Amino acid sequence: MSVRHSGIGMTSPRTRVRMVERLREQGVRDEVVLAAMGSIPRHLFVEEALASRAYEDVALPINYGQTISSPWIVGRMSELLRNGGNNSLRKVLEIGTGCGYQTAVLAKIANEVYSIERIGPLLTRTRIRLRELGIRNIYLKHADGMRGLLEAGPFDGIMMTAVIPEIPETLLEQLAMGGRMVFPKGNRQQYLCVIDHTTEGFVETILDEVMFVPILPGTINR
């Protein structure tokens, strides 16, 4: 089974360059993140019928009621996780693998990436896609992301790619001292937030207004 498709026209390397230039204009400043996003063929992470729109600044459907986040969201969340390079990101946990694009970006800016996806068939396709791209520092697991991945923690960074009303205590316990969590929080009204694990405890900062699909418990096998 292969999930590759061709990259021509609006999926050319020049299109990635223009995407990165647009991200700079939109305020993404971290050159490590921009280089990572410029090196990854985003069009390979969407259905072929949508490949020509892959570099537009929009979220796109990826089946199973899920979406691939817009380039700006991916850049913004990745930049926040790196925290200006102050977070070393030796080990990162991603909750919500989805199509794997954000996962691939994380693999470029972190030493090890552990990613959890609740939808089994979606994870199978993503696993193949990442393998075909030669990305090896990613560990994927089919599981309920609400529980995190205690056996692999603690993590220098945790990223959640679906909105949640409140962060469960079990996830906070998996954030290393000095680490940072980036996630969308809310219900109808949603905000991008960060939680820093400091010597004084967990410090939450509310940032941009956003819109994400909700996180759901349990797993889907077919």
UniProtKB/Swiss-Prot annotation:
Its EC number is 2.1.1.77. It is found in: Cytoplasm. Keywords: Cytoplasm, Methyltransferase, S-adenosyl-L-methionine, Transferase. GO terms for cellular component: cytoplasm. One of its GO terms (molecular function) is protein-L-isoaspartate (D-aspartate) O-methyltransferase activity. Belongs to the methyltransferase superfamily. L-isoaspartyl/D-aspartyl protein methyltransferase family. Catalyzes the methyl esterification of L-isoaspartyl residues in peptides and proteins that result from spontaneous decomposition of normal L-aspartyl and L-asparaginyl residues. It plays a role in the repair and/or degradation of damaged proteins. This is Protein-L-isoaspartate O-methyltransferase. It comes from Nitrosomonas eutropha (strain DSM 101675 / C91 / Nm57). The gene is pcm.
